[in-house]
Amino acid sequence: MRRSTGSHRSRAVVLAAVAALGAGLLSGCADDGDDGSAGSSGGGDSKGKTVVTVGTYGVMGFKQAGLYDEYTKLHPDIKIEENVIDPASNYYPQLLTHLGSGSGLADIQAVEVGNINEVTTTQADKFVDLSKADGVKKENFLDWKWSQATAKDGKTIGLGTDVGPMAICYRKDLFQQAGLPSDRDAVSELWAGDWQKYLEAGKDYAKKAPGGAAFLDSAGGLFNAAVSGGSEVYYDKSGKPIYKDSPAVKKAWKLATDASAAKLSAGLQEFTKPWQQALANGKFATASCPAWMLGQIKEYAGDKYKGKWDVAAAPKPANWGGSFLSVPQAAKNKDEAVKLATWLTAPEQQAKLFEKQASFPSAQAAYDLPQVADAKLPYFNDAPIGKIFSQAAKDSPTQVLGPKDAVIKQNFTDVGLLQVEQQGKSANEGWKAAIKTNDNALDQ
């Protein structure tokens, strides 16, 4: 569920594509064509075309934005097959298994930012160095985005697809019914500068909560949003795990468990079927919204709620998420895979993904340009997403990543906080469960 960054072509092309922004978001969910593996190796089809396989998770949007169709029209001898596994927590272990065996890999494999450090430190020799690919230029990428996928020997094994600057998505109509401000500037002001103010707004909302709709979807989502505003979260700059004592983690944990205790959360696990159904049925009024989340909301809330969702600034700047495209050395169609990965992450394709998916560009040079800064999305009440996310991206701290970032984060949300939200455990019991699970994971 993420997207693009630089290549060799003129930024003018980016502007031309982004100028069309406002046409809307996601038109449909990616094929759920997975066969239980992180990828399937490519080859040829019965018509003599070269089949390039792409292993992804969630809604990355290449298909939805028409990029696969566009590429195959430009290259009629190529056929693209996308294999989707959802969520990323299921996808990544399978990717590691296939890397270990050297078989079953797609020609292109997506890697989520929470896993990229482990891949660059332990698996880099199993991927192509994309910094040497024709058309790839380092300067087209945010420095920190490029460095996240660069190993110690200088080999860059992934091209960034997006970044995840933070906002808050909210149901304007539910805020009105609850007697809260509904104008996005006024809503942003409700909680400006402090996540605790966000909870206070939730308590005011709960006094007149309409139709049984909770204030927020998930304590786990709130935790991830708040913790993503830190620079040293699960690891310090020396590479030492600090999740037990991290001030950022402890503060986000208290925020999330306080929200649960105050019954502000719908108690859902994000990205699951119940969460998707809750969106479709209007069962919560806000969600922590990195840029890529807008595509999720539009997809699962559907046309029924077009114009009722809006986007406000987050209490504090943060970056949650982002992905990369990598090409395994074991890819059957390695040369064609490199060409496709380079093309998919080129600036003009990045702009098309922004247009269709609200997948926020990694090209910082585009942020202040009017075609990006003034971008609006009809589904979200013409929210100025270019302005909102540009500011959040500029203000977000550079995060220290460690090998097990994704695992640690998942255990806090899907073990600790789920026990609190869905099993009635205390905040302290949930914390101990998360810490124990993380300790065990890091000992393996």
Tell what function each PLM region has:
Residues 380-434:
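C-terminal capping/gating helix-and-loop segments adjacent to ligand/active sites or protein-protein/ligand interfaces
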Residues 2-117, 135, 182, 332-336, ...:
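Conserved N-terminal structural module of periplasmic/extracytoplasmic solute-binding proteins
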Residues 118-122, 146-186, 217-238, 320-326, ...:
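Periplasmic solute-binding protein
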Residues 199-202, 239-269:
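Glycine-centered hinge/linker elements that transmit conformational signals in sensory
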Residues 112-167, 306-310, 376:
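Hinge/lid segment of periplasmic solute-binding proteins
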Residues 131-141, 185-192, 232-251, 299-304, ...:
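Short, solvent-exposed loop/beta-turn-alpha elements that line the ligand-binding surface or hinge
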Residues 84-94, 113-114, 191-197, 267-281:
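Short helix-initiation/N-cap motifs at beta->coil->alpha
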Residues 261, 300-362:
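Extracytoplasmic/periplasmic substrate-recognition and gating elements
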